[in-house]
């Protein structure tokens, strides 16, 4: 995206398509941009997709710091992401904060699997950004979980890969990826965007 279409100076915040789920306000946006600038982070990569629904995957996920960084990024972009959490975590009082930040409870013991629940949640929204960490854990995970892929495939949504590159302090956007149905080939193509050197703790990303 041309520099003239970005805001936030060195933080390089991309313009977001008008139909994207929004949250926050200009004042909070400026505060988050200032925090990103203060800590040396900036946005790089492709445009933000202009699609009704997407599965946004964030990797590498090796640190508790990924969550506050993600919150700062979402408010700097003024987008509303929807993430999933175990339904028991949404009890009072923690549930208030989790819902405020875009959390949606899912019941893993339900007769409807988590993939089905998530697809139903996304299809129940006019526009949705489903945010997932494909590793499913901060610990070393040689293989990615496949739930995000099945959600995208069953929901007819593109996968939008985003890297938290701690080495370069970049929140990097990659081109949207449309599942082909070849799981192994598609996972390999998606994983090629990410390297251990990007991670906060490289030894915890394979």
Feature annotation, model-predicted:
Residues 2-43:
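Extreme N-terminal tail/first-helix region
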């Amino acid at each position: 995206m041309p520099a003239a279409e970005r805001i936030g100076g060195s933080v390089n915040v991309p313009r977001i398509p008008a139909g994207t789920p929004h949250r926050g306000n200009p004042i909070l946006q400026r505060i988050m941009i200032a925090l990103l600038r203060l800590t040396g982070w900036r946005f790089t990569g492709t445009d933000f997709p202009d699609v009704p629904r997407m599965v946004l995957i964030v990797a590498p996920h090796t640190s508790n710091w990924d969550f506050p960084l993600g919150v700062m990024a979402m408010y700097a972009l003024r987008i509303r992401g929807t993430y999933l959490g175990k339904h028991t975590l949404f009890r009072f009082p923690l549930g208030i904060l989790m819902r405020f930040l875009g959390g949606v409870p899912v019941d893993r013991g339900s007769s409807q699997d988590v993939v089905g629940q998530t697809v139903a949640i996304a299809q129940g929204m006019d526009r949705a950004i489903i945010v997932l960490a494909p590793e499913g854990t901060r610990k070393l995970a040689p293989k990615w979980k496949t739930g995000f892929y099945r959600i995208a495939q069953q929901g007819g949504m593109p996968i939008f890969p985003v890297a938290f590159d701690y080495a370069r302090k970049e929140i990097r956007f990659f081109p949207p990826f449309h599942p082909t149905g070849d799981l192994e080939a598609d996972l390999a193509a998606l994983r090629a965007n990410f390297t251990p050197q990007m991670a906060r703790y490289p030894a915890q990303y394979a």
